[in-house]
């Protein structure tokens, strides 16, 4: 994604932790998973016109019993959802999205862009601690492998019972 430095762009966790507030009216959320839905609803509560951009052909395409509740919350908040598109680049208060055929669309993003496009495992700390100490280290949840929250919950419970 080019041009992120020219726009008002942040990551979902920074926004949800209250580290970032946006002026402007039109906000974009990049990523249509559960976190993206939560961010979109919060932005809508701030009075913004929110659009979710999802690269997959279906919004909230996850096997989970909570999906209908998230879909309803997004719908009730008046959030627009565009599927089958990805963010191509940002140019100040404009975002260019593109579909799989290369067709581009320009969207206003004066109210900020929140990237909620998933997480990556982070094993560096575990590896460093194992190399430098005698402490037994257990890594769980998305820090180990990105999955659904139910997997992380079970894994955390299992490790807690072991120690």
Q: Each predicted region: which residue ranges?
A:
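Conserved N-terminal Rossmann-fold NAD(P) cofactor-binding segment
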Residues: 67-70, 93-94
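Positively charged, proline/Ser/Thr-rich regional signature most characteristic
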Residues: 1-7
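General small-molecule cofactor/ligand-binding pocket signal
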Residues: 10, 80-82, 138
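A conserved short coil-to-beta-strand element within the FAD-binding core of flavoproteins
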Residues: 83-95, 120
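Rossmann-like dinucleotide/flavin-binding elements
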Residues: 5, 13-65, 101-112, 116-163
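Helical element adjacent to the flavin cofactor pocket in flavoenzyme catalytic cores
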Residues: 70-78
């Amino acid at each position: 994604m080019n041009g992120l430095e020219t726009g008002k762009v942040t990551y979902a966790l920074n926004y949800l932790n209250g580290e970032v507030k946006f002026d402007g009216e039109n906000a974009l959320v990049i990523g249509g998973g559960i976190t993206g839905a939560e961010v979109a609803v919060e932005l809508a509560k701030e009075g913004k016109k929110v659009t979710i951009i999802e690269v997959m052909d279906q919004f909230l395409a996850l096997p989970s019993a909570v999906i209908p509740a998230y879909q309803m919350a997004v719908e009730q908040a008046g959030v627009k959802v565009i599927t089958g598109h990805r963010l191509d680049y940002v140019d100040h208060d404009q975002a260019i999205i593109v579909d799989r055929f290369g067709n581009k669309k320009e969207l206003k993003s004066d109210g900020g862009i929140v990237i909620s496009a998933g997480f990556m495992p982070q094993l560096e700390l575990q590896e460093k601690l194992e190399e430098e100490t005698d402490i037994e280290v257990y890594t769980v949840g998305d820090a180990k492998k990105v999955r659904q929250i139910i997997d992380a919950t079970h894994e955390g419970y299992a490790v807690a019972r072991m120690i």
